[in-house]
Amino acid sequence: MRAVVQRVSRGVVTVGEETVGEIGHGFVVLLGVGREDTPDDAAYLAEKIANLRVFADENGKLNRSVLENGGSVLVVSQFTLFGDCRKGRRPGFSAAAPPERAVELYAEFVRRLAALGVPTAQGRFQEHMEVLIVNDGPVTLILDSRKLF
């Protein structure tokens, strides 16, 4: 499972004219589910993201988590995080989980975040979305549950 985690002052997802997810300060997480992923991958990333210390404390040091900072997380499915661009000019997506499996693990990730006490909002799985991300910093991190990077 892969996640691009962006610290934001605001995040909004719309589908057509409908706003389906919106947060103030916190994280926008673009989440990709891999073919080999399990619920353990969802649990690992949820715990890691909930406790990442990338928010400033009273001394300006990046020492607080989204939980400690009172933030929220907007989760957006993003199968293209498993795109393989090593050959040719068109990415291959064979490493991404099939949609019926990916939606289960995406939902598990969101459930795990919420169980840790993180307020969450979501995009809409397998829909064309417009995502507004107002970066704060910017602070952007790339995480992989298999610790590949």
Curated annotation (Swiss-Prot):
EC number: 3.1.1.96
InterPro entries associated with the record: Daa-tRNA_deacyls_DTD, DTD-like_sf
Coiled-coil intervals, chain numbering: none
Recorded GO MF terms: D-tyrosyl-tRNA(Tyr) deacylase activity; Gly-tRNA(Ala) deacylase activity; Ser(Gly)-tRNA(Ala) hydrolase activity; tRNA binding
UniProt keyword list: Cytoplasm, Hydrolase, RNA-binding, tRNA-binding
Residue ranges of the motif Gly-cisPro motif, important for rejection of L-amino acids: 137-138
GO biological process: D-amino acid catabolic process
Localization: Cytoplasm
Reactions catalysed: glycyl-tRNA(Ala) + H2O = tRNA(Ala) + glycine + H(+); a D-aminoacyl-tRNA + H2O = a tRNA + a D-alpha-amino acid + H(+)
Quaternary structure (record): Homodimer.
Notes concerning its domains: A Gly-cisPro motif from one monomer fits into the active site of the other monomer to allow specific chiral rejection of L-amino acids.
NCBIfam families per UniProt: D-aminoacyl-tRNA deacylase
Family note: Belongs to the DTD family.
Full protein name: D-aminoacyl-tRNA deacylase
